[in-house]
């Protein structure tokens, strides 16, 4: 209040300003009164072409109601007003900000994103208490030097502007913790960036950078660095010393090799897809003990080293669209791996139908091949019992050796009784009835309830889940993709051990409510349905949920509270009709999407 009181004085031009303001959308006096009490004013999305003068002078002019109300009630003590500390002017039609912004010296947050600003007032430099400035999604071509005087600024959001250069003294903003410069026209970064030692998140995505300054390694607090979609051919070797780095995004550049990061012991996510990387070697991997996400899709990688098994915390590995012809069978020993993408590779030792069975089936197969690989490393792997020879009716070898009952790709409408009879004295743990013409789940599946833990009914014509299936109390994996399901029975709640369920390519219009109560679920695949909404509060209760695939549904909005589901490591939302988060945010990966959603939660 002190700063505002010192500036409080009569305004001889008030009459002229008031007349001009009558031509602009009015700001309700109720909002102004509330802002004087709370210190916060939200004018987002009001169609403002300019900021009314009485907003800038909110703490200077005597409120009009003070002349009309002489009761001096406790609720009307206008002289006890609070200095404005938070001003939101987002999503209007502002072309400029007045220099009168200096009349709000107590501001800690100023949000002017999504306007049409082409410049910023030099008076911003006088807001010495400012901690967060959001001027993203405007048309800014430069930043005033005075902005560098904001020594307490912690968050500066400049994404989606037209900046081609930054002031050399940018490093003066020593308190910065978050800096977003994505989607501009930057060709270089000032060397003074090295002084930003408190920076935690730096986003340089979608610019025109050809290299990064070696001095960037001085940012010892940096946890997230996003250089997606630039022209980088390499990264400085000094990057390897950034010990705090947790997320590194290098997608859509011109890299020919992965950087070696021996000191990045905390790195959890490395995204380097859509580059020109040809070699993945042990040196790239051996120090990354904390890595949970490795994304290398759309490169030219020819082989995967056995050292991939050093990444024991890896949960997501994306190697799609490379030149890989053979996988090391030891890949099956990555016990935490929940998602493995291999499509678009010329794999000779893995059949396509096996790839379609999902990550867990593939890992299981790779583990089963480890001993054979040691015994005859130069031989092509023989046909295994994972698929049955077409002339074989029931594969007893698969039943007795692999505990697998496989009657897939027979195009039958009913599973013959002798198939179930074959396993009476040989309990199986896996059942594969996929790619048939089944319209219902076989009732005799209940006979397997004491042993089976993995069931595949994918690619049939099943319209409902039977109660018999709900008795399989040991079930951990259930695949019912590509059927005609519209709902799930509440009795499925009894499947208390179920970890993975695949419901993709069905006809669900609502998210099956029973899934919210199946708290052991780690993976829900529900892509290519017609789901219109989700309940983030219920999802947050699912503390084991790590993967949620809702691609190609009918979601009109993504609830911001979904960002609080911090156990999610893979969240796929592409192909829905919602407008936010935008595609550029989705492309950054799950962590960025969740962070964006959290930032949208009303406070």
Swiss-Prot record:
PROSITE patterns: LRR. The lineage of its organism: Eukaryota, Metazoa, Chordata, Craniata, Vertebrata. Pfam families: LRR_1 (PF00560), LRR_14 (PF23598), LRR_8 (PF13855). The keyword Repeat applies. The keyword Transmembrane does not apply. It comes from Gallus gallus. LRR repeats lie at residues 83-104, 106-127, 129-150, 152-173, 175-196, 198-219, 221-242, 244-265, 266-286, 290-311, 313-335, 336-357, 401-422, 427-449, 451-473, 474-495, 497-518, 520-541, 544-565, 567-588. The gene is LRRC40. Residues 1-27 are annotated as: Disordered. Keywords: Leucine-rich repeat, Repeat. InterPro entries: Leu-rich_rpt, Leu-rich_rpt_typical-subtyp, LRR_dom_sf, LRR_domain-containing, LRR_R13L4/SHOC2-like. This is Leucine-rich repeat-containing protein 40.
């Amino acid at each position: 209040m002190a700063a505002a009181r010192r500036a409080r004085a009569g305004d001889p031009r008030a009459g002229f300003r008031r007349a001009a303001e009558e031509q602009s959308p009015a700001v309700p006096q109720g909002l102004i009164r509330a802002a004087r009490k709370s210190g916060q004013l939200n004018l987002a999305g009001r169609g403002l072409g300019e900021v009314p003068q009485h907003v800038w002078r909110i703490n200077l002019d005597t409120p009009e109601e003070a002349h009309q109300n002489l009761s001096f009630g406790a609720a009307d003590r206008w002289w006890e007003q609070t200095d404005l500390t938070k001003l939101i002017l987002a999503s209007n039609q502002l072309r400029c900000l007045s220099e009168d912004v200096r009349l709000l010296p107590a501001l800690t947050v100023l949000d002017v994103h999504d306007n049409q600003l082409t410049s910023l007032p030099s008076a911003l430099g006088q807001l010495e208490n400012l901690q967060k400035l959001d001027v993203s999604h405007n048309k800014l071509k430069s930043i005033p030097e005075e902005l560098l005087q904001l020594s307490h600024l912690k968050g500066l959001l400049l994404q989606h502007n037209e900046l081609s250069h930054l002031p050399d003294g940018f490093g003066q903003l020593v308190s910065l913790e978050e800096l977003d410069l994505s989607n501009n026209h930057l060709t270089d970064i000032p060397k003074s960036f090295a002084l930003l030692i408190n920076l935690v998140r730096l986003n340089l995505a979608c610019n025109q950078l050809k290299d990064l300054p070696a001095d960037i390694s001085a940012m010892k607090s940096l946890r997230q660095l996003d250089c997606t979609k630039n022209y980088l051919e390499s990264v400085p070797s000094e990057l390897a010393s950034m010990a705090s780095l947790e997320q590194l995004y290098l997608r859509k550049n011109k890299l020919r090799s992965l950087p070696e990061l021996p000191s990045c012991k905390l790195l959890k996510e490395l995204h380097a897809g859509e580059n020109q990387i040809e070699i993945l070697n042990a040196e790239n991997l051996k120090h990354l003990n904390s890595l949970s996400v490795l994304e290398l899709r759309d490169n030219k990688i020819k082989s995967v080293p056995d050292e991939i098994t050093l990444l024991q915390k890896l949960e997501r590995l994306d190697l799609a669209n490379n030149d890989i012809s053979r996988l090391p069978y030891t890949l099956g020993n990555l016990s935490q791996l929940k998602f493995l993408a291999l499509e678009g590779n010329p794999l000779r030792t893995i059949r396509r139908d096996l790839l379609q069975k999902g990550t867990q089936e593939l890992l299981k197969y790779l583990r089963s091949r480890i001993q054979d690989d040691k015994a005859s490393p130069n031989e092509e792997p023989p046909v295994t019992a994972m698929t049955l020879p077409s002339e074989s009716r029931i594969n007893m070898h698969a039943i007795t050796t692999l505990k697998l009952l496989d009657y897939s790709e027979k195009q039958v409408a009913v599973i013959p009784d002798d198939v179930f009879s074959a396993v009476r004295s040989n309990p199986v743990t896996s059942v594969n009835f996929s790619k048939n013409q089944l319209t219902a789940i076989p009732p005799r599946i209940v006979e397997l309830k004491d042993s089976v833990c993995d069931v595949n009914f994918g690619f049939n014509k099943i319209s409902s889940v039977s109660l018999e299936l709900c008795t399989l109390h040991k079930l951990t994996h259930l695949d019912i993709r590509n059927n005609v399901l519209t709902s799930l029975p509440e009795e499925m709640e009894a499947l208390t051990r179920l970890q993975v369920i695949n419901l993709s390519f069905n006809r669900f219009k609502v998210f099956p409510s029973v899934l919210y109560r199946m708290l052991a679920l780690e993976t829900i695949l529900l892509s290519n349905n017609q789901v219109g909404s989700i309940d983030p509060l219920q999802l947050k209760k699912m503390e084991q949920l790590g993967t949620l695939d809702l691609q190609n549904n009918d979601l009109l909005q993504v609830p911001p509270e979904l960002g609080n589901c911090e156990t999610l490591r893979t969240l796929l939302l592409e192909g829905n009709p919602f407008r936010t988060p935008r595609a550029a945010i989705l492309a950054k990966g799950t962590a960025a999407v969740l962070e964006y959603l959290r930032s949208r939660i009303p406070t």
